[in-house]
Amino acid sequence: MTTAVPRLIEQFEHGLDAPICLTWELTYACNLACVHCLSSSGKRDPGELSTRQCQDIIDELERMQVFYVNIGGGEPTVRPDFWELVDYATAHHVGVKFSTNGVRINPEVAARLAASDCVDVQISLDGATAEVNDAVRGAGSFAMAVRALENLAAAGFADAKISVVVTRHNVGQLDDFAALADRYGATLRITRLRPSGRGADVWEELHPTAAQQVALYDWLVAKGERVLTGDSFFHLAPLGSSGALAGLNMCGAGRVVCLIDPVGDVYACPFAIHDRFLAGNVLTDGGFDQVWKNAPLFRQLREPQSAGACGSCGHYDSCRGGCMAAKFFTGLPLDGPDPECVQGYGAPALAQERHAPRPRVDHSRGSRE
């Protein structure tokens, strides 16, 4: 590791003038009801930001020189002004990456996307077969996602992403996912299952076993050179030598990443939609720039963090204690071990009596909110 890398990580830990990765959930409306949805999406929130309010945020992002925004939901393409907002963002030098289940990616839309140099598309797929995928994402969702990939490939869209949430039921399909990506000229992106949103209700039964975590690490080291992971799997880093696993080995919440939700609330992390991690609101707290730079929560997160119960572990520098959201939503202390700690410290903590907080909002169809 060069000396530049530790300096860069130190800079990340103290926060940047603008987020590297800004996730923006434009809507909670969704045509699917995935059992592990991190935002408990389904129904549109009546307080959803207007088109003009969204454009004001984009204007701020341009002034802050944010490179791109990662748009999700819900299913963002069902919002009536989605394409208007995409065009507005790219015209104002803010690139767009959006996540979709593929419902609106018909041949005409695929051709439109292929003609743009500023838009990246990520198709969600949680099984390399319909049987595995549809068990968590709903009947017909596999065929819908594959049809979107086919349309993008036929239109000449370069380098779509296939985004996979790794579960104990699909971790054995990693080679199949990679083959699927190759078939459509796409790049594979895999992410960690967090106990966030509806994921809190199914985490115990869906998260990979300890043996599968090791198998996942081995696969990433052996075959993951062209696989995107972001900061999803830094909790696996203690399984090998320093630098063996690509990606950022730290929690970027409030430092280099954050989330704007459909009503303008700003959270430290896309997987931590709870009052504990609410930094402010773009409408009532002076705009996004003001929240990002001055919110007390973000200032706190950018201070040196205590290693807590993990301080005596020789692997702390590798994983930094793991994922904040995973700990919080399983009822574990934030300065304790990750629930999936590969050194085995998470399992005893999970076995103790604990209170797991519930997500702040639930827009699932059938919920009362």
From Swiss-Prot:
Database matches in SMART domains: Elp3 (SM00729)
Domain of life: Bacteria
Record-listed [4Fe-4S] cluster 3 binding positions: 310, 313, 319, 341
Family in the record: Belongs to the radical SAM superfamily. MftC family.
Annotated Pfam families: Radical_SAM, SPASM
Domain Radical SAM core: 16-232
Keyword Oxidoreductase appears in the UniProt entry: yes
Chain's role: Radical S-adenosylmethionine (SAM) enzyme responsible for the first step of the biosynthesis of the enzyme cofactor mycofactocin (MFT). Catalyzes two reactions at the C-terminus of the mycofactocin precursor (the MftA peptide). The first one is the oxidative decarboxylation of the C-terminal L-tyrosine of MftA, forming an unsaturated tyramine moiety. The second reaction is the cross-linking of the tyramine with the penultimate L-valine residue, forming a five-membered lactam ring. Its activity requires the presence of the MftB chaperone.
UniProt binding sites for [4Fe-4S] cluster 1: 30, 34, 37
Binding site for [4Fe-4S] cluster 2: 251, 258, 269, 323
Biased composition (Basic and acidic residues): 352-369
Protein name in the entry: Mycofactocin maturase MftC
Organism: Mycobacterium ulcerans (strain Agy99)
Cofactor remark from the record: Binds 3 [4Fe-4S] clusters. One cluster is coordinated with 3 cysteines and an exchangeable S-adenosyl-L-methionine. All three [Fe-S] clusters are required for MftC modification of MftA.
UniProt KW keywords: 4Fe-4S, Iron, Iron-sulfur, Lyase, Metal-binding, Oxidoreductase, S-adenosyl-L-methionine
EC number: 4.1.99.26, 1.3.98.7
Region described as Disordered: 347-369
GO MF annotations in UniProt: 4 iron, 4 sulfur cluster binding; lyase activity; metal ion binding; oxidoreductase activity
Reaction catalyzed: [mycofactocin precursor peptide]-C-terminal glycyl-L-valyl-L-tyrosine + S-adenosyl-L-methionine = [mycofactocin precursor peptide]-C-terminal glycyl-N-{[2-(4-hydroxyphenyl)ethenyl]-3-methylbutanamide} + 5'-deoxyadenosine + L-methionine + CO2; [mycofactocin precursor peptide]-C-terminal glycyl-N-{[2-(4-hydroxyphenyl)ethenyl]-3-methylbutanamide} + AH2 + S-adenosyl-L-methionine = [mycofactocin precursor peptide]-C-terminal glycyl-N-{5-[(4-hydroxyphenyl)methyl]-4,4-dimethyl-2-oxopyrrolidin-3-yl}acetamide + 5'-deoxyadenosine + L-methionine + A + H(+)
Cofactor: [4Fe-4S] cluster
Chain segments annotated as transmembrane: none
Source organism phylogeny: Bacteria, Bacillati, Actinomycetota, Actinomycetes, Mycobacteriales
Subunit and partners: Interacts with MftB.
Gene3D superfamilies: Aldolase class I (3.20.20.70)
